[in-house]
């Protein structure tokens, strides 16, 4: 294969200050380091984390100026001299974890998302809201050629994240799992992964469009939190005692704390969504007496990533996506803040 022609400049969305103007403009194409690949990003999903990165409202500093995005799917067009795991023309994915140290106590047990020296795409390393982006070749995801690059983009964060959360819940096939925020980008994927893993799914969200989507994707029960008079009672009745696990992907502190009330005795509450400044509160007596576990789950490691991608490549999981141009990113953030997104927005970097 002849070497692709790589331009000196590209289109991207960049901001210079937290919460500052989102500028769609010409920016330089990065040069891959010795251990990196350069990916011609065709499509990028938009995650709630990207909104936080722009606002700068997490207790973790971003680099500035910053190109956000960490769900980038594209084609390898260049690679550093030490890279032997990718070839030019391969499909590759840019994930949240861009690079880890691979030597700390966490990396040694394959918990590289917890590496204190990790760099994050679209946060501390320029991400996928540009036409060309770099990623460490060890962390970059290998995407099978049978995959649609637009549809697989959300799998690279949302899919991996909810798949890992379901593994963290450690429940058995046939048991109940509740998903809060089930109609959003993470939630719609959580419903599908849970179904594919053999669980019975109860979806919690609001709105007729989200109810239809969740049920079409495999949810057995949908509870509209805005309509129910007693959500805790309704959830426990529908699952005959409460779900064995709850996957909290909503960005609601109230939803998190409410899930501790309705989860089944001996059940597990998994925290995934990160509402700014939120606190998880659990009555200690009830948590001890009912033997409830509360666990955090933070993206996934390389094995989790490839497993999540395999579910997609086998057709067991689909991405309910809406494709718009990269230049329209600010519109997506506005809809995200208003809670009006069903499924996932994906940006076409050519527009």
From Swiss-Prot:
Q: Where does Zn(2+) 2 bind?
A: 101, 104, 107, 115
Keyword list (alphabetical) reads:
Metal-binding, NAD, Oxidoreductase, Zinc
Q: Which InterPro entries match?
A: ADH-like_C, ADH-like_N, ADH_Zn_CS, GroES-like_sf, NAD(P)-bd_dom_sf, PKS_ER
* Thermal behaviour (record text): Optimum temperature is 28-33 degrees Celsius. Active from 22 to 37 degrees Celsius.
**Residues where Zn(2+) 1 binds:** 47, 70, 157
E.C. number: 1.1.1.1
User: What reaction does this enzyme carry out catalytically?
Assistant: a secondary alcohol + NAD(+) = a ketone + NADH + H(+)
Organism domain of life: Eukaryota
Q: Please list the cofactors this protein needs.
A: Zn(2+)
What does the cofactor field's note say? Binds 2 Zn(2+) ions per subunit.
Group of enzyme by EC: oxidoreductase
A GO MF term: zinc ion binding
Q: Which GO terms describe its cellular component?
A: cytoplasm
**UniProt: NAD(+) binding residues:** 181-187, 205, 210, 272-274, 344
Q: How does activity depend on pH?
A: Optimum pH is 9.5 for the oxidation reaction, and 6.5 for the reduction reaction.
The family classification in the record reads: Belongs to the zinc-containing alcohol dehydrogenase family.
Q: What PANTHER family would the database entry show?
A: ALCOHOL DEHYDROGENASE 1-RELATED
Task: Report quaternary structure and partners.
Answer: Homotetramer.
Q: What does this protein do?
A: Versatile oxidoreductase that catalyzes the oxidation and reduction of a broad range of substrates. Preferentially oxidizes secondary alcohols. Has highest activity for racemic 2-octanol. Is also an efficient reductase for selected substrates. Substrate selectivity was found for medium chain lipophilic ketones. Has highest activities for 2-octanone, 2-nonanone and 2-decanone. The enzyme is (S)-selective in the reduction direction and produces exclusively the (S)-enantiomer.
According to UniProt, the name of this protein is Alcohol dehydrogenase 2
Q: Which gene encodes it?
A: ADH2
């Amino acid at each position: 294969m002849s070497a692709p022609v790589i331009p000196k400049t590209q289109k991207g969305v960049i901001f210079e200050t937290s919460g500052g103007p989102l500028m769609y403009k010409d920016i330089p194409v990065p040069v891959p380091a010795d251990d990196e690949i350069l990916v011609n990003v065709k499509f990028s999903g938009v995650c709630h984390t990207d909104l936080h990165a722009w606002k700068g409202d997490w207790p973790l500093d971003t680099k500035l100026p910053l190109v956000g995005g960490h769900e980038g799917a594209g084609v390898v067009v260049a690679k550093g001299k030490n890279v032997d795991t990718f070839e030019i023309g391969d499909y590759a994915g840019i994930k949240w974890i861009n690079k880890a140290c691979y030597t700390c106590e966490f990396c040694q047990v394959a918990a590289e998302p917890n590496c204190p020296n990790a760099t994050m795409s679209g946060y501390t390393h320029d991400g996928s809201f540009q036409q060309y982006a770099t990623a460490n070749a060890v962390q970059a995801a290998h995407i099978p050629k049978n995959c649609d690059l637009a549809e697989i983009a959300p799998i690279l964060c949302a899919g991996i994240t909810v798949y890992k959360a379901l593994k963290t819940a450690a429940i058995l096939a046939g048991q109940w799992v509740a998903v809060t925020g089930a109609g959003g980008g993470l939630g719609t994927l959580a419903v599908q992964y849970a179904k594919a893993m053999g669980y019975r799914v109860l979806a919690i969200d609001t709105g007729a469009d989200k109810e239809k989507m969740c049920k079409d994707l495999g949810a057995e029960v949908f509870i509209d939190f805005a309509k129910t008079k007693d959500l805790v009672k309704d959830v426990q009745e529908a699952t005959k005692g409460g779900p064995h696990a709850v996957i909290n992907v909503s960005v609601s502190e109230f939803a998190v704390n409410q899930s501790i009330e309705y989860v089944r005795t001996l059940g597990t509450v998994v925290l995934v969504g990160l509402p700014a400044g939120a606190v998880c509160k659990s009555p200690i007596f009830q948590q001890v007496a009912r033997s409830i576990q509360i666990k955090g789950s933070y993206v996934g490691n390389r094995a989790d990533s490839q497993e999540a991608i395999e579910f997609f490549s086998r057709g067991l999981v689909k991405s309910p996506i809406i494709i718009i141009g990269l230049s329209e990113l600010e519109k997506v953030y506005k809809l995200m803040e208003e809670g009006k997104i069903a499924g996932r927005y994906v940006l076409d970097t050519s527009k």
